[in-house]
Swiss-Prot record:
It comes from Ralstonia nicotianae (strain ATCC BAA-1114 / GMI1000) (Ralstonia solanacearum). GO terms for biological process: tetrahydrobiopterin biosynthetic process. Belongs to the pterin-4-alpha-carbinolamine dehydratase family. It is an enzyme of class 4 (lyase). The lineage of its organism: Bacteria, Pseudomonadati, Pseudomonadota, Betaproteobacteria, Burkholderiales. This is Putative pterin-4-alpha-carbinolamine dehydratase. PANTHER family: PTERIN-4-ALPHA-CARBINOLAMINE DEHYDRATASE. The keyword Lipid biosynthesis does not apply.
Length: 101
């Protein structure tokens, strides 16, 4: 099983990725992204989906019009791992490229 992130790694992750927060009910991180419209939100989700397939690590997400809520956790490890950190970094880049507010 993959090890979960330790306290130091978590602090570094949150410092690097502003706006992400730890969920209260489980060992997962969450962020809400807002875009100009549905097309921009869907374009963002498409970029993330392609990367998720490539690395075989998939987000939990919810989309309503221009808003996308994303939660990351590694189910096999029952918590946050480097896979979540890596995908969160990619998600941040994709959000910038697609005009997240």
């Amino acid at each position: 099983m993959m090890p979960t992130l330790n306290d130091e790694q978590r602090k570094a992750l949150f410092a690097e990725l502003p706006g992400w927060s730890l969920q209260n009910d489980r060992d997962a991180i969450h962020k809400r992204f807002t875009f100009t419209d549905f097309n921009a939100a869907f374009g963002f989700m498409t970029r993330v989906a392609l990367k998720a397939e490539q690395v075989n690590h998939h987000p939990e997400w919810f989309n309503v019009w221009n808003r996308v809520d994303i939660t990351l956790s590694t189910h096999d490890a029952n918590g946050l791992t480097h896979r979540d950190a890596d995908l969160a970094r990619f998600i941040e880049q994709a959000a910038q490229l697609t005009g997240a507010k």
